[in-house]
Regions:
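An N-terminal boundary/leader segment
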Residues: 1-53, 290-292
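Short, well-ordered beta-strand elements within core beta-sheets of diverse protein domains
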Residues: 11-18, 97-101, 212-219
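Residue-level signal for inorganic ion chemistry
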Residues: 30, 52, 105, 224, ...
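Long amphipathic alpha-helix in the N-terminal Rossmann-like dinucleotide-binding domain
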Residues: 50-57, 116-117, 126
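Immediate post-signal peptide segment of exported/extracytoplasmic ligand-binding proteins
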Residues: 59-75, 223, 253-263
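Enzymes and membrane/adaptor proteins characterized by extended Gly/Ser/Thr/Asp/Glu-rich
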Residues: 71-108
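Short glycine/serine-rich loop segments
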Residues: 102-234
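A short helix-breaking turn/cap at a secondary-structure junction
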Residues: 193-285, 291
Length: 301
């Protein structure tokens, strides 16, 4: 393969499982991009390369000896720096927590590891996840990989920028009022804010108990679907987490949207949007309708 860092998460995981590429090759390809561009983009604020390389080698050994592999086996990732890992740095984007090392590990991080993925570092974010642009006075602003003077969107700024810049194949973010959706949009990638209670929030810095969600940012919707299959599900350590069975989200991506009704507000939605944004939205609606969805336009009171 010419550029393994350009693979989607699903392509990368499948390539490792088939032996077409090794995990260490994926990791080093991502690091080449990171070393070249992170000084300008500032998406990654700390790394543990030694541990990540050890995890990659262990993943490759598992493939060689034909152990059962998880859905994300051998894929390097990173996380918004508000996910806790026991003994690891978790700054939450603030000088107040510049040396905070929690004693617990987030359920989502553990589930990703059980599926074979490994994280190599913490990603830039708005301080305590509290602004929509991704600016940060302590660790420096995160910049949009496509146009450095532009914002990445926040608060999961490093999550959006790192995936777009091909520093990793997916990143974990959080969304209280748009903090997965905004960076995904601004950085041109795919992001998913799950229905609240679908994914455990245990071990993730709380911002708003009634609004917080955690979820993936990746290159494709299929990538997000595979991650959701791994991280969703009840967690006894998060009493708000739902008990409904977790489907295989990826297998349900048939493209058939019959029976789905999509509401599109005619006000308070695209009122102040630039013309290209409106055009992109309308083009997306045409695609969705072509797949069988019913588009219902309505006015908000």
């Amino acid at each position: 393969m010419e550029d393994v860092a350009a693979l989607s998460l699903v392509e990368a995981a499948d390539a490792v499982a088939s032996g077409e590429v090794t995990s260490i090759e994926l990791l080093r390809a991502c690091w080449i991009n990171l070393d070249a561009a992170n000084p300008r983009i500032n998406a990654v604020i700390w790394q543990d390369r030694e541990e990540a390389e050890a995890a990659a080698r262990a993943a490759d050994q598992a493939v060689r000896i034909k152990r059962p592999l998880g859905k994300l086996h051998g894929v390097p990732m990173a996380h918004k720096d508000m996910y806790y890992q026991a003994g690891k740095l978790s700054t939450c984007g603030s000088a107040l927590r510049h040396d905070f090392r929690p004693a617990i590990t987030a359920t989502v991080i553990s589930r990703m590891a059980e599926a074979g993925a490994y994280t190599f570092g913490g990603l830039n974010m708005a301080e305590f996840a509290q602004n929509p642009t991704g600016h940060n006075k302590t660790f420096g602003d995160c910049h949009n990989p496509w146009n450095l003077p532009y914002v990445t969107g926040g608060s999961s700024s490093g999550s959006g920028a790192s995936v777009a810049a091909r520093f990793n194949y997916m990143a974990l973010g959080s969304d209280t009022g748009g903090s997965i959706r905004l960076p995904a949009s601004a950085c041109g990638i795919s992001g998913l804010k799950p229905t609240q209670t679908r994914v455990s929030r245990y071990g993730v810095m709380p911002l708003s108990f009634s609004h917080d969600n955690v979820g993936p940012l990746a290159r494709t919707a299929r990538d997000c679907a595979r991650v959701m299959t791994v991280i969703a599900g009840h967690d006894p350590r998060d009493p708000t987490s739902a008990r409904e069975p977790v489907p295989d989200y990826e297998s349900q991506m048939t493209g058939n949207l019959r029976g789905l009704r999509i509401g599109v507000p005619t006000n308070y939605f695209l009122d102040d949007a630039d013309d290209p944004v409106v055009a992109a939205m309308e083009s997306a609606l045409v695609v969705l309708a072509g797949r069988g969805a019913t588009i219902s336009r309505f006015a908000l009171p």
